[in-house]
Amino acid sequence: FKKFWPVDLHIIGAEINKFHTIYWPAMLMSAGLALPKEIFVHGLFTVNGQKMSKTVGNVIDPMDMADKFGSDAARYLLLSQFPASEHGDVKADDFVNKYNSDLANGVGNLLERSFTMMIDYRAGVLDEKNDIEEKIKNLAEKTEKNYENNFENYKLYEALAEVFVFIKNLDRYINDEKPWALNKNKDEKLDVILNSLLFGIEKIIAWLEPFMPSKMAEAKNYLTKLKRGELKKEDKLGLFPRR
C-alpha cells in the first residue's frame, strides 16, 4: 500500500463524492487502514457540449490522443481545458487548433526563434556576466509564485495558464526589443536581451517539466548542446511540429 497506493491524496470524480468521502473512509477504518490525508474531487465534463457516450461516438480515448499528438501534448490538451475542480466542457473538436496555437506557435516557436538567434548571433555561447532585465526577472518571480501556489493546491489548469501568459510576454519582449536590429547595428544590449531570453526559457522548461517531461527533456538536451557551442543554425529543435 505504501508504495503503490499511498494515502497522501485520494482523487475522485464528483459523481462518487458521497461514497468516497463517507463510506470508503469508514471501510478503511474498520479494516485498520490509514485514511487519505487529502481528497480532491474533480468536476464532471461533457465533450463538445454532449455527455460522453459510446453510442454517440464522442468518447475521448487518451491512447488515440497520445498516438496523434504525443503523450506530452495530449496531457496538456486535456489539462488546459478547464479547472479540474469545476464542471466543464472538453472542446475535442478544437484539439488541433489548440495544439497549433499553444504548442507549435506558442512555446515551440518561442524556443525555436530564441535558440536560432542565440546560435546565429553568438554561436550559442552567451556571456553569463551580462545582466538580465529587471522586468523579465520580476515577471518570472511573479509567475513562479502563482505557479507554485496553484500547483501545491492541485490547480493544474491555473498553473499552466500562468506559464503560457509568461510565454506570450516573452514573445512580446522579443517583438518589442527587436534583437535582429540590435545585431545588425552591433548594439551591446543584444547580449542582455539574449541572456534575459535564456533566463526566461530555463524557467519555462522547469515549469512545464511536470506536464511535458519528454519534450522538456529534449529542450534541456538541446540547450546543453547550444551552450557548448555545438549547434549550427540549421540544427532545429522542432519541439512541436504543426498539425
For each predicted feature, which ranges?
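Long, charged, glycine-rich C-terminal linkers/tails
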Residues: K37-L44
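Catalytic adenosine-cofactor/nucleotide-binding cores of aminoacyl-tRNA synthetases and other
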Residues: L44-D131, T224-R243
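Secondary-structure capping and boundary motifs in well-ordered enzyme cores
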Residues: G13-I16, M65-F69, F95-G106, I132-L139, ...
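Short acidic alpha-helical/loop segments enriched in Asp/Glu that coordinate divalent cations
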Residues: T116-E133, N153-E162, I174-K184
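Active-site cores that bind ATP or allylic diphosphates and position pyrophosphate for catalysis
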Residues: F1-A14
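Basic, alpha-helical terminal appendages of large translation-related enzymes
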Residues: N138, K145, N149, Y154-K155, ...
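Residue-level signal for inorganic ion chemistry
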Residues: H20, V107, V163, P213
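Short active-site loop/helix that positions an aromatic residue
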Residues: T21-A31
